[in-house]
């Protein structure tokens, strides 16, 4: 596999942006064990590749364990990820848990299965992290995913809420990180093509695609074509919030304002807006308890081993 200078610039950009996100949000610290969730899509392949490259030259020591969850979907090519992960030399685990049957049992035919499937998958990931002693869980969401989620919540949920680059799980046991938070989907797709990753289709479950997310994505791409850099600016706004110029009384004490107490941006009082010259670019439920870990596959020095583990 030969690469051009354009590829090396792309690779450098992705590594630089990922390293910056890790530093800005304190995603990975010395001594961490990071469970890298692998779906078989372009995002997770890119995330693992970049994290492995950064690990080699990082000033801190941290451990990577790649994980794939085989949800027993019909037609899932279960050999693809183990073969790829073995070729990289990374420590990995393959977890089999039949979430597919539970989803099919619970969700009526024709209805979207994504919500329940996601919840069950999340439960298995958390339990796997605990089993392996991983304190960080890395997901492959990128900048475009974060912006897309921001508009989904605003349009359909009435909230200014996106995907945080870093958050604690509800029980406080793990930290979830999104190392690709500064990376564009366009760059990730180009990198995945150049690296010839063995991509696994994402439609094996037969569930209807999230039409709302698709529409928002199409809207954003149309904006980007008309005004290149717009997605960068939207993402930049998520990192440059001014509570006093919104309308959330929980974020800013509007009732306590009085003359002579605070300076304000007077232009905004009269509806004026200041624009930048250039776009800103930033380098456990009962169902869960039914799941059983059928297999842990990890590559030892000679051959893979199989362990039995159950969820209590």
Curated annotation (Swiss-Prot):
Gene Ontology MF terms: 4 iron, 4 sulfur cluster binding; ATP binding; magnesium ion binding; sulfurtransferase activity; tRNA binding
Keyword annotations of the record: 4Fe-4S, ATP-binding, Cytoplasm, Iron, Iron-sulfur, Magnesium, Metal-binding, Nucleotide-binding, RNA-binding, Transferase, tRNA processing, tRNA-binding
Coiled-coil regions listed in the entry: none
Superkingdom field: Bacteria
Subcellular location(s) of the protein: Cytoplasm
Cofactor annotation: Mg(2+); [4Fe-4S] cluster
Reaction equation(s) it catalyzes: cytidine(32) in tRNA + S-sulfanyl-L-cysteinyl-[cysteine desulfurase] + AH2 + ATP = 2-thiocytidine(32) in tRNA + L-cysteinyl-[cysteine desulfurase] + A + AMP + diphosphate + H(+)
A Pfam match: ATP_bind_3
Residues that bind [4Fe-4S] cluster: 114, 117, 205
Cofactor binding mode and count: Binds 1 [4Fe-4S] cluster per subunit. The cluster is chelated by three Cys residues, the fourth Fe has a free coordination site that may bind a sulfur atom transferred from the persulfide of IscS.
GO biological process, one term: tRNA thio-modification
Pathway: tRNA modification
Gene Ontology, cellular component aspect: cytoplasm
Span of the annotated motif PP-loop motif: 39-44
Family as reported in the entry's similarity comment: Belongs to the TtcA family.
Quaternary state and interactors: Homodimer.
More about this protein: The thiolation reaction likely consists of two steps: a first activation step by ATP to form an adenylated intermediate of the target base of tRNA, and a second nucleophilic substitution step of the sulfur (S) atom supplied by the hydrosulfide attached to the Fe-S cluster.
Protein's UniProt name: tRNA-cytidine(32) 2-sulfurtransferase
